[in-house]
């Protein structure tokens, strides 16, 4: 349940809102999370969204979590994402292809910074296209486990920077998309 997000206040909660499909590259996200957890043991990853679109891929993701012994990766299935956003510290998107990712905008509306791969309009959302609000997240290359892990560690270890990026994202989404 959404209330579970709040049970461990000492945790840093990462949210991924997506369909569990190959184009979202959930396996890279899981591997990066495993590396990041070595440096920041109090991380928790919430993967929110349907798992029935590509059941074989979803099963491979579940198996990877089991194999890597990652009890702090939670697949919620379909949920009301807004119930979770307030308990998260930042969002993550590791897609290999994307258009205008709504999940980043939803996170910004909740003042959450984002880690995202450099696909679609992610660069514009994180760095601004025609505004001077500042960075609202960390951009990474696709399928780059180390870079994505480093971004997770960076945001997890720097709550002040995280808060500032979240504020920047909030201003960006309010100015451009409200």
List PLM regions with ranges.
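Short hydrophobic beta-strand element within catalytic cores of glycosyltransferases
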Residues: 113-116, 123-126
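Aromatic "clamp/platform" in nucleotide-sugar-dependent glycosyltransferases that forms part
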Residues: 96
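A short, well-ordered alpha-helix in the C-terminal region of glycosyltransferases
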Residues: 154, 161-175
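Conserved donor-binding/catalytic core segment of Leloir-type glycosyltransferases
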Residues: 7-24, 30-33, 46
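Short, small-residue-biased leader/transition segments that mark boundaries at the very start
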Residues: 1-6
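Glycosyltransferase donor-sugar binding loop
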Residues: 17, 44-59
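Nucleotide-activated donor-binding/catalytic signature segment of Leloir-type glycosyltransferases, i.e.
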Residues: 58-78
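Conserved acidic donor-binding segment of nucleotide-sugar-dependent glycosyltransferases
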Residues: 127-145, 154-159
């Amino acid at each position: 349940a959404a209330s579970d997000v709040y049970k461990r206040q000492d945790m840093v909660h990462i949210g991924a809102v997506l369909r569990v499909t190959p184009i979202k590259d959930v396996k890279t996200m899981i591997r990066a999370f495993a590396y990041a957890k070595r440096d920041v043991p109090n991380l928790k990853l919430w993967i929110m969204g349907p798992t029935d679109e590509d059941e074989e891929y979803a099963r491979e993701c579940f198996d990877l979590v089991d194999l890597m012994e990652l009890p702090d990766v939670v697949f919620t299935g379909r949920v009301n994402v807004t119930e979770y956003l307030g308990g998260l510290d930042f969002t993550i998107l590791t897609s290999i292809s994307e258009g205008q990712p709504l999940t980043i905008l939803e996170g910004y509306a909740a003042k959450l910074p984002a880690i995202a791969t450099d696909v679609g309009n992610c660069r514009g959302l994180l760095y601004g296209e025609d505004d001077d609000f500042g960075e609202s997240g960390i951009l990474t290359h696709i399928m780059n486990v180390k870079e994505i892990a480093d971004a997770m560690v960076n945001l997890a270890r720097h709550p002040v920077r995280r808060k500032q990026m979240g504020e920047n994202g909030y201003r960006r989404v309010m100015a451009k998309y409200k």
